[in-house]
Amino acid sequence: MAGVSAVRWLGLRSRLGQPLTGRRAGLCKQARSCRFYSGSATLSKVEGTDITGIEEVVIPKKKTWDKVAVLQALASTVNRDTTSVPYVFQDDPYLIPASSLESRLFLLAKKSGENVAKFIINSYPKYFQKDIAEPHIPCLMPEYFEPQIKDISEAALKERIELRKVKASVDMFDQLLQAGTTVSLETTNSLLDLLCYFGDQEPSTDYHFQQTEQSEALEVENDETSRRKAGHQFGVTWQAKNNAERIFSLMPEKNAHSYCTMIRGMVKHRAYEQALNLYTELLNNRLHADVYTFNALTEATVCVINGKFEEKWSKIQELLRHMVAQKVKPNLQTFNTILKCLRRFHVFARSPALRILREMKAIGIEPSLATYHHIIHVFDQPGDPLKRSSFIIYDIMNELMGKRFSPKDPDDDKFFQSAMSICSSLRDLELAYQVHGLLNTGDNWKFIGPDHHRNFYYSKFFDLICLMEQIDVTLKWYEDLIPSVYFPHSQTLIHLLQALDVANRLEMIPKIWKDSKEYGHTFRSDLREEILKLMARDKHPPELQVAFADCAADIKSAYESQHIRQTAQDWPATSLYCIAILFLRAGRTQEAWNMLELFRKHNKIPRSELLNELMDSAKVSNSPSQAIEVVELASAFSLPICEGLTQRVMSDFAINQEQKEALGNLTALTSDSDTDSSSDSDSDTSEGK
């Protein structure tokens, strides 16, 4: 027991960090990096003997946690609320969007508010000097966009380059040359980087919230030019003899960086031929290009040559051989650029695309989602029903299942849209579930892309579920995805209605109509007509007929609320017929009879089925006046059923002499109109002969 006490005391003192003396201190020094344990509950050996079971303590390496690790841990403890809209919209309950259009307006307004706040902070920086954020958040503090160095020096030029002042940087460079000051090669290359990236034009206002008088004058000067362009970044073209070319020609010494910057700038702004010519000059000067320049040259090669596929593919292979000769190792973007270029040639590019994919794996480059996105487009055309699928999507999914991806290429967020589009074309629900499972693996959901990409993906996914899945599973997906993930399009709701029709679950129609109103589809005529047709097609139990009639009355109110847009075509005959039939079947007779006025008002011809049901309703209520009104409506449109309705009135109702005369006049008018129409047709036939 004394030995046990000694060992426990030593362990306690060593854990508490208390100093030891004498024999105990010596033992502790030897055992400071060791941990004692015994194979049994009691220690059989006394102090001073060998202690069995000594295990070396391995101190773990320091782990660097992400700044939002705590938030990520907390977020992992909760699930998505399927009854609410996406979290980005959960601000003011009165501002929560209810449709795709409103959600886009919400996001634009939110981004505009952020830009305005940033503009105010940068316009009045003296009022925002106190940093209250812990840790420091740079975007909450003012940014200084105006140069602080006023004299003419290379330091001033560097400052203007860092501030992305294109015109000011060029002016400072020219002033330095006029003063006889030699600008270093590094600074000149930085200036070329700025000019080539922005195409020798001032950046858009997204980069500068403060506009000085000089920049405003420059904006007015370039206004006419900018209007001819489709957009700032995508519309800028490379101008001949611009400042970049002028400064490049003035450089007394050029290195590989100078040439590579110019080549990439020319390709970025669609000066492909100039880029290829400059690459030839680079080779003549015995310089080597970097991998990013070769990536740009690959794009330029495909865009500039107006030849056949074999010629363009030969040029791409020649560039790859140049990379080998210059000992430039390709990266992921190299292969993705080649695959993106091969998409132009479809069937001809299938074999080269597979060779490129095998080469990637052979040199140890892991393909990204963008790689498989380009492969899909080489073998298939998502969304094109005329193209026969090559089924390569199955091989891709077998390779990707269970993997977690990180962003490596700007086109990574396009893979899931392409894959789900192929699933929709193939009508393969199991494959769609695999794609959706891959999306929900780890953080792959971040690659769903912007709002319109997400809507496209989930629309295709849910449409396929409506077409192929059982109705209970379909409704479960409906509750899970809408509106917590995306807002459905009216066509998506029509597909859901068709699924309900196939499964004989029409009792869900009133709920679908209620949801469609919340999602902003109240005035979608195709959706309203589909709902009315399904409700009016067959007879149902009384409780369901009452619910259908309420839904029909709500749809009727939606038609009537279209003040300016309401025209004759806004009230199709089918909708009028369905609403009247639903009112009759639910016992709302007066509302059904009121629908007859709408037929006359909008000049719509009622169906014979509706007239017969109206006649049955008049017979049940024993109302000869209503029966005669039905005959009058049929006579007004010269319907063939008018004579049969007249006979029903004569046989089924007790009418007076005045009503008999009215019926006789209606019958005579109908027969006269029939005679006139037949004579007109006979005369037309004789004239034709």
UniProtKB/Swiss-Prot annotation:
Annotated transit peptide: 1-37
Membrane-spanning ranges: none
GO MF annotation list: ribosomal small subunit binding; rRNA binding
Keyword check for Amino-acid biosynthesis: no
Compartment annotation: Mitochondrion
GO biological process: mitochondrial translation; regulation of translation
InterPro entries linked to this entry: Pentatricopeptide_rpt, PTCD3, Rib_mS39_PPR, TPR-like_helical_dom_sf
Key word Transit peptide present: yes
UniProt keyword terms in alphabetical order: Acetylation, Mitochondrion, Repeat, Ribonucleoprotein, Ribosomal protein, RNA-binding, rRNA-binding, Transit peptide, Translation regulation
Main localization of the protein described in the UniProt heading: mitochondrion
PTM sites of type N6-acetyllysine: K126
One Pfam family this sequence matches: Rib_mS39_PPR
Cross-referenced Gene3D superfamilies: Tetratricopeptide repeat domain
PROSITE patterns: PPR
Ranges: PPR repeats: 149-183, 184-219, 255-289, 290-330, 331-367, 368-404, 412-446, 454-488, 489-523, 572-606
Region (Disordered): 665-689
Biased composition (Acidic residues): 673-689
Family as reported in the entry's similarity comment: Belongs to the mitochondrion-specific ribosomal protein mS39 family.
Task performed by this protein: Mitochondrial RNA-binding protein that has a role in mitochondrial translation.
Subunit text: Component of the mitochondrial ribosome small subunit (28S) which comprises a 12S rRNA and about 30 distinct proteins. Associated with the 12S mitochondrial rRNA (12S mt-rRNA).
Protein name from the UniProt record: Small ribosomal subunit protein mS39
Organism: Pongo abelii (Sumatran orangutan)
